UniProtKB/Swiss-Prot annotation:
This is Delta(3,5)-Delta(2,4)-dienoyl-CoA isomerase, mitochondrial. Keywords: Acetylation, Fatty acid metabolism, Isomerase, Lipid metabolism, Mitochondrion, Peroxisome, Phosphoprotein, Transit peptide. A motif (Microbody targeting signal) lies at residues 325-327. Substrate binds at S115, G116, I117, D118, L119, G173. Belongs to the enoyl-CoA hydratase/isomerase family. It catalyses: (3E,5Z)-octadienoyl-CoA = (2E,4E)-octadienoyl-CoA; (3E,5Z,8Z,11Z,14Z)-eicosapentaenoyl-CoA = (2E,4E,8Z,11Z,14Z)-eicosapentaenoyl-CoA.
């Protein structure tokens, strides 16, 4: 590894000193720090992002380097209509290329996160495909399902960390969506429901593929899938589906934005590289993942972000004072 690094032996010594003396600073987020960030974030009025204009979602700049993507059909309980499946793909493709964005918070407007697919709007597309040849209808439906699957895969493939903030119901397609996010917070009144079996079909846009890897309990996933029962917030926390539960929506959003602000203050090279390698490691063996990591870092270890971080640590400056270049 030393061979791969193009830094001096003195700087390597500084790196070791940094790891010994400032690990808590770099790897632990204190509740006090999060509370301060949350208060600061709540004072800022969200600003519309000019190149994100949609019918079913709203994108605002919550704070510096942080975007807020909100499911925005509260009168329909944020049901996922035809526009949603197209717009979320467009939205996250833009976010992936947005060099100023370093973290994303996804939430739902109104009384709940989402009620899932909008059956009234989607019925004609799903239930009455054109044509009378079974093979051709099958190919049409396969292409349609693949298109819907991409709607949530773009979240997973987005290199910026995505935090889901869930309140009220998260039903059907909502579980597919949050399973593709990196971090999940919820309110005490939240519940999660894999509803598809009650509609006569198997969930087909990500839940069955991602949820077992998220919570690591195949028996529980099977139970939730086969029965369509509700998983309440406390059970979601115990199972590992969410990492924190909050009393109400405001407290949850404040914490989500505080975490996003903290993440966005870190090196984007380090954060985005970590997300990409975590996802790769989830789907590959340890040996394959270590090899991928070595190949990745043979380039990334040459970043100026390391030098900036070490200098800040040696000067006892807050890491938030470092100015990292856009990525």
């Amino acid at each position: 590894m030393a061979t791969a690094m193009t830094v001096s032996s003195k700087l390597r010594g500084l790196l070791m000193q940094q790891l010994r003396g400032t690990s808590q600073l770099y790897f632990n987020i204190s509740l006090r720090s999060l509370s301060s960030s949350a208060q600061e974030a709540s004072k800022r009025a969200p600003e519309e992002v000019s190149d994100h204009n949609y019918e079913s979602i709203q994108v605002t700049s919550a704070q510096k380097h942080v975007l807020h993507v909100q499911l925005n059909r509260p009168e329909k309980r944020n049901a996922m209509n035809r526009a949603f499946w197209r717009e979320l793909v467009e939205c996250f493709q833009k976010i992936s290329k947005d060099s100023d964005c370093r973290a994303v918070v996804v939430s739902g407007a109104g009384k709940m996160f989402t009620s899932g697919i909008d059956l009234m709007d989607m019925a004609s597309e799903l239930m009455q495909p054109s044509g009378d040849d079974a093979a051709r209808i099958a190919w049409y439906l396969r292409d349609l399902i693949s298109k819907y699957q991409k709607t949530f895969t773009v979240i997973e493939k987005c290199p910026k960390p995505v935090i889901a903030a869930i309140h009220g119901g998260c039903i059907g397609g909502g579980v597919d969506l949050v399973s593709a996010c990196d971090i999940r917070y919820c309110t005490q009144d939240a519940f999660f429901q894999i509803k598809e079996v009650d509609m006569g079909l198997a969930a087909d846009v990500g839940t069955l593929q991602r949820l077992p890897k998220v919570i690591g309990n195949q028996s529980l996933v099977n139970e939730l899938t086969f029965s369509a029962r509700k998983m309440m917030a406390d059970e979601a926390l115990d199972s590992g589906l969410v990492s924190r539960v909050f009393q109400d929506k405001d407290a949850m959003l404040n914490a989500a934005f505080a975490l996003a602000a903290d993440i966005s203050s870190k090196s984007p090279v380090a954060v985005q590289g970590s997300k990409i390698n975590l996802i790769y490691s989830r789907d590959h063996s340890v040996d394959e993942s270590l090899d991928y990591m070595a190949t990745w870092n043979m380039s990334m270890l040459q970043t100026q972000d390391i030098i900036k971080s070490v200098q800040a640590a040696m000067e006892k400056r807050d890491t938030k004072s470092i100015t990292f270049s856009k990525l």
